[in-house]
Regions:
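Active-site helix/loop module of the DD-peptidase/beta-lactamase fold
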Residues: 7, 53, 58-61, 76-115, ...
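Active-site SXXK
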Residues: 12, 26, 32, 55-83, ...
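Flexible glycine/proline-enriched surface loops and loop-helix/loop-strand junctions
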Residues: 51-54, 123-128, 138-140, 195-203
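Active-site Gly/Thr loop motif
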Residues: 182-205, 243-301
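Structured C-terminal helix/loop/strand segments within mature extracytoplasmic catalytic/sensor domains
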Residues: 281-343
């Protein structure tokens, strides 16, 4: 094994240990081929199966990239006129005063300014488009929007139009425990469970996939919707999802987003992408540790999987996310950035 590959895997193992994850996996594709694959650990914090190619991880918020593709279809098929349509044009069941000026673009780029209290009431943190904050309420609204537009769940569209043509066998919204599912650890001393959310939350939660199929999901985007020479997803849908759709912020520290994906424009302090990763790259993350990095400049897809809720580093977790993508950049012959470009 190339020394730089081993160095990256050692780093993945180190963070796995520090964060009390029981499992880790790495799959790297370049030029449509797997060039590195690594599995270690077990499915939970009690006696359980060894991690392997069939192990299905709960990817938590990384499922946003799947919802993003569904909304990309809605735009492509003119179900939505524009990203700049106000949400109130489609959904009437929310307080119109609070939602005033909130567009689909704001919801898809985390610039909507909405949040939710423990009692379920919605309030506004800042005016739509004026800042950026990662909150969960936009996922529920966008999920509702898709169902309003198509009269069925976005998961059905993905299964029929994407998963089946790709031949996916191990990507599913799981509702029952099985030996293939990697359990999520909240606390090392507590029993782990395969689910993060209630079955009926309506947001396509508890999406499980293997490291290989997660990498193929990234590779589909890298190839602009093509898989083994066949155009599975329209190129325009992929372009919508993975190009910058966020507005310019007064605060230069805030990240750029496509449709939920973080997109590398230039190094941003509050972005999860490392400053050494080339422009045009994009990444998605879940709080159980899955990370999918796509680097078009080097025709590269990098997947890292864990099974511990909350990413290592506490309030400084972004540092470790950037550190991983920077190390991946160094390992797979992406030119390193100079000190002048570092944060």
């Amino acid at each position: 094994m190339h020394p730089s590959y081993q160095k990256l895997l050692s780093y993945v193992s180190e963070i796995k240990h520090l964060n009390h994850s029981s499992a880790a996996a790495v799959v790297v594709m370049q030029n449509d081929q797997i060039i590195l694959e690594h599995y270690e650990g077990v499915h939970g914090n009690e006696h359980s199966n060894l991690i392997g190619i069939d192990s299905m991880f709960n990817i938590a918020s990384a499922r946003k990239s799947y919802l993003a593709l569904a909304i990309g279809y809605a735009l492509y098929e003119k179900k939505i006129h524009s990203l700049d349509d106000c949400v109130s044009k489609y959904l009437k069941n929310y307080d119109q005063q609070i939602f005033q000026g909130t567009t689909i673009r704001h919801l898809m780029t985390h610039s909507h300014g909405l949040d939710e209290r423990d009692d379920g009431s919605i309030y506004r943190e800042f005016a739509a488009g004026e800042s950026w904050a990662y909150r969960g309420i936009n996922i529920r609204i966008i999920t509702e929007l898709f169902k309003y537009l198509y009269d069925y769940d976005f998961t059905q569209l993905l299964k029929e139009r994407v998963f089946m043509p790709l031949g996916f066998k191990s990507t599913e919204w799981s509702t029952e425990e099985s030996e293939a599912l990697v359990k999520v650890i909240d606390y090392p001393e507590q029993k782990a469970t395969f689910q993060l959310y209630p079955y009926d939350d309506g947001m396509g939660s508890n999406l499980h996939t293997t490291a290989r199929e997660f990498a193929l999901w990234g590779n589909l985007h890298l190839n602009m919707g093509r898989h083994e020479g066949i155009q599975v997803v329209p190129e325009d849908v992929i372009r919508l999802c993975t190009s910058i759709q966020s507005l310019q912020y007064d605060d230069g520290r805030l990240p750029a987003n496509g449709l939920f994906w973080y997109v590398q424009e230039k190094a941003k302090e509050r972005s999860e992408i490392g400053e050494c990763v080339p422009k045009g790259s994009y990444q998605i993350l879940g709080n159980t540790g899955p990370l999918l990095l796509v680097v078009p400049e080097n025709h590269l897809v990098v997947v890292r999987m864990y099974n511990k809720r909350y990413n290592y580093g506490g309030k400084n977790y972004l540092h470790y996310l950037r550190e991983f993508s920077n190390r991946a950049s160094d390992a797979f012959t992406i030119p390193s950035c100079s000190k002048m470009h570092r944060l």
